[in-house]
Amino acid sequence: MWNPLHETDSTSVAWRRPRWLCAGALVLAAGLFVLGFLFGWFIKSPNEAANISPQHNVKKAFLDELKAENIKTFLYNFTRIPHLAGTEQNFQLAKQIQSQWKEFGLDSVELAHYDVLLSYPNKTRPNYISIIDEDGNEIFNTSLFEPPPPGYENVSDVVPPFSAFSPQGMPEGDLVYVNYARTEDFFKLERDMKINCSGKILIARYGKIFRGNKVKNAQLAGAKGIILYSDPADYFAPGVQSYPDGWNLPGGGVQRGNILNLNGAGDPLTPGYPANEYAYRLQIAEAVGLPRIPVHPIGYSDAQKLLEKMGGSAPPDDSWKGSLHVPYNVGPGFTGNFSTQKVKMHIHSDNKVKRIYNVIGTLRGAVEPDRYVILGGHRDSWVFGGIDPQSGAAVVHEIVRSFGKLKKEGWRPRRTVLFASWDAEEYGLFGSTEWAEENSRILQERGVAYINADSSIEGNYTLRVDCTPLMYSLVYNLTKELQSPDEGFEGKSLFESWNEKSPSPEFSGLPRISKLGSGNDFEVFFQRLGIASGRARYTKDWVTNKFSSYPLYHSVYETYELVEKFYDPTFKYHLAVAQVRGGIVFELANSVVRPFDCRDYAVVLRNYADKLYNISMNHPQEMKAYSVSFDSLFSAVKNFTEIASNFSERVQDLDKNNPILLRIMNDQLMFLERAFIVPLGLPDRAFYRHVIYAPSSHNKYMGESFPGIYDALFDIENKVDPSKAWGEVKRQISIAAFTVQAAAGTLREVA
C-alpha cells in the first residue's frame, strides 16, 4: 500500500535533496494516497472483495488465539536447566519440542542433525587469569565460576564463563587497556598515542561491537591474548539493583559468547557445505574463523583488581573511562611498586566435533505448497536462557500452537509455513546455516521469506524491527491493527506507541526500522541466499539508556525469574511480539499477492547512494584525480525507482483470478531480494553475497548499506597505495550499479 515513505514523482526529485520532504509534498502525497486507495478499492473484483472478510476473520482468530499465559508457561518449562549446544539436555529439549509440535497439529516435524565443531571448558583444568610476581607466583586469580542465582544452587551442568573457541595457551606479559577494542580505539592507541600492543595482553570492555571483532582487532595489533570484561558503565543501569534484587549485572556476573570471525561460513570445518556424515572436514589448523590468541571473559569485580594497578599513559579522553573506581590508565603494564608484576592467562578449553539437532516443522500450503514462509529461532543457550533465547522460543511455540489449532479446524495457509528450532546459534549460527546449506537449492527456488524469532525482549520500552525494505509496508500496516501494550497508550495501536517512542530519523510520521546486520539466524537466509528477512522484539529506550543491550546477557543470572519479576510480569510484551511475528508470517503465507512493496527499496537505495556519495566527497581532490564518479549508481537507482513504480501500478491492476499472471508477479516479488545477490560475494567475505546489505566489517551486529563501497572508502586516506585503493572504490561502484540495474530488470513486465 502507498504510504508516506514513497514519493509521488520519482523522476522529478533531485538526487541530492534535503532529508525532509516539504509540507506541500506531504499534502500531495496524502492526497494521492487517498485517491489511490479509493481507486484500488473500487476496482476490486467481486470475488476478491468477497474473500476479504473470511481471510480477515481467520487472521483475527489466529491472533486472538495467542495467549500471554501460555507463553509464560512455555518460558518457565524451557528454562529449568541449561541447554548448551551439543549436550544431552538440548537434545532432549529438541525431542520435547518435536513431540509437542506434532500434538499441536503440524503435518510433519523432523529432526535434522549435523556434526559441527563446538568448544567447551576443560572440566579438570579451569580457565582463569592471574597476576604473577617476578618469580612467577600467582598473587591474584580471577573467579572460576559465577555465584549461582537463588533457587539454582543445585542445578548441575552450568558451564563456567568462557570464550568459545579460544585456543589453549598460557601467555604472560604487560597489560594494555584498549577501551572497547574497536578499530577507532586501536587507531587512537597506535597512531595518536604511539602505544604498541604487539606482544602485550589486552583488556577490553564488552559493548559497542561484536566480541569477535574485538578479538580480530587484537590479533591485528599483535597482541598475545585479550581479556574481556563487563564494565558497570555498560552493564549497570543507574538506580537499579543488581540481580536478584534488580536486573543489573552483579560484580561476579560474566558474559559468555563465541569469538569467531566466520563471515557467514557456518561450521568452521565445512564452510559452504552441510556438516553431514559424509562431509569433507578441514583440519583444525585450516578451520575458518578460529581465533589465534587466547581469550577469556571476567566480571567487573575481577577487572577492578587488574585495572586498579595500571600505569603508563592516562586515558586519552572521558570516553575511555567506565564506572569502576580506577584511573583507566592505558599502560602498558602496572604502576609503581607493581611494575614488576605481569598478567598471565590460563586457557585450556577444548574444541570438539559434536552432534546438534534442529527441529523442522511443516504446515503444508493449500494453494502454493511449493512456496515457503519460514519462522525460526534458536533453542540452545549458554545457561538458562531466560531472555536469550527462550523468550523467543516460547513465542514460537505459541505461534505454532495457534496455527495448529486453525489447521485442526480445517484451515490451511495458502503457502507452506516452515517452523524451525535451531541448535548451536550461540556458537556461530551453526544449526540454521548447516540446514540452509543442505537445502540451499530448494530454498533459492521456493523461499518467500524468513522471520527470525530469537529473544522476544531486550527491554520493555517499545517495539524494535529490523527487516528488508520489502517488508516495511507490511510491518507498518500490521502494527496499525494491533493494540499497544505500553502504559499510557491504552486504546491506541502498536504503530502509534512505536512511532512516538522510536520515530524514524529519515521518514516523517513513521517508526524507525533498522537494517539487518548479523549475529542471528537470519544471516544465511538474507546475506547468502537472498531471501527476504526480518525480525521484531521489544527493546529498551536507546536514547536515554546508554548501557549495552540488557545487563545480564549470556550470564548465569538470565533466568525465568529475571523476566517474570522485572521485565514482563504479565507477559504482555511477549504477547505483542508474538502478534507481530505471527501476524507477519500469517500475511506472508496467506496474502494473495505477496505483501512486498518494491517502491520502498527504491527510496532507501537512493538514500544509501546519497550517503556514500557524501562520504566520498570528503576527498574531492582524490575523486577528481582518480576519476571516481557515482553517476552510474545514481542512474541505476533512478531506473530502479521508475520500474518499481510501474511494477506497483501493474500489481494494482492485476487480475487476481488469473493464476498465471498472479504467479508471475508473485515470483517477481519473491525473487527481487535474490537479484541483489552476487555469486562471488563481497571482498574477503565470500559468504556475504548481498550487494545492498551486509554486516559491518567492524561490528558484525550492525548492518551496513552498499558494504562493498563503504569498506573500500573506509580509512582510505591512510591506505599505502592510493591509486589501488581508489581503483577498488570504482570497482565496487560498478558492481553496485550493475546489481541495481539487474534487479530493476527483474521487475519489468514479462514479455
Swiss-Prot record:
Q: How does it sit in the membrane?
A: Single-pass type II membrane protein
**Reaction equations catalysed:** Release of an unsubstituted, C-terminal glutamyl residue, typically from Ac-Asp-Glu or folylpoly-gamma-glutamates
* GO terms assigned for molecular function: carboxypeptidase activity; dipeptidase activity; metal ion binding; metallocarboxypeptidase activity
Q: In this UniProt entry, which residues form the Extracellular topological domain(s)?
A: 44-750
Tissues with expression: High expression in the duodenum and in the jejunum brush-border membrane. Weak expression in kidney.
Q: Name one GO cellular component term.
A: plasma membrane
Query: Which ranges does the record mark as transmembrane?
Result: 20-43
PTM sites of type Phosphoserine: 10
Q: Which residues are glycosylated?
A: 51, 77, 122, 141, 154, 196, 337, 460, 477, 614, 639, 646
Keywords annotated in UniProt:
Calcium, Carboxypeptidase, Cell membrane, Dipeptidase, Glycoprotein, Hydrolase, Membrane, Metal-binding, Metalloprotease, Multifunctional enzyme, Phosphoprotein, Protease, Signal-anchor, Transmembrane, Transmembrane helix, Zinc
Please summarize the record's notes on activators and inhibitors of this protein: The NAALADase activity is inhibited by quisqualic acid, beta-NAAG and 2-(phosphonomethyl) pentanedioic acid (PMPA). Ethanol ingestion decreases the folate hydrolase activity by 50%.
Task: Tell me the compartments it is located in.
Answer: Cell membrane
Q: Where is this region: NAALADase?
A: 275-588
Similarity comment text for this entry: Belongs to the peptidase M28 family. M28B subfamily.
| Free-text domain note | The NAALADase activity is found in the central region, the dipeptidyl peptidase IV type activity in the C-terminal.
Q: Report the protein's function.
A: Has both folate hydrolase and N-acetylated-alpha-linked-acidic dipeptidase (NAALADase) activity. Has a preference for tri-alpha-glutamate peptides. In the intestine, required for the uptake of folate. In the brain, modulates excitatory neurotransmission through the hydrolysis of the neuropeptide, N-aceylaspartylglutamate (NAAG), thereby releasing glutamate. Also exhibits a dipeptidyl-peptidase IV type activity. In vitro, cleaves Gly-Pro-AMC.
What name does UniProt use for this protein? Answer: Glutamate carboxypeptidase 2
Provenance organism: Sus scrofa
Organism placement in taxonomy = Eukaryota, Metazoa, Chordata, Craniata, Vertebrata
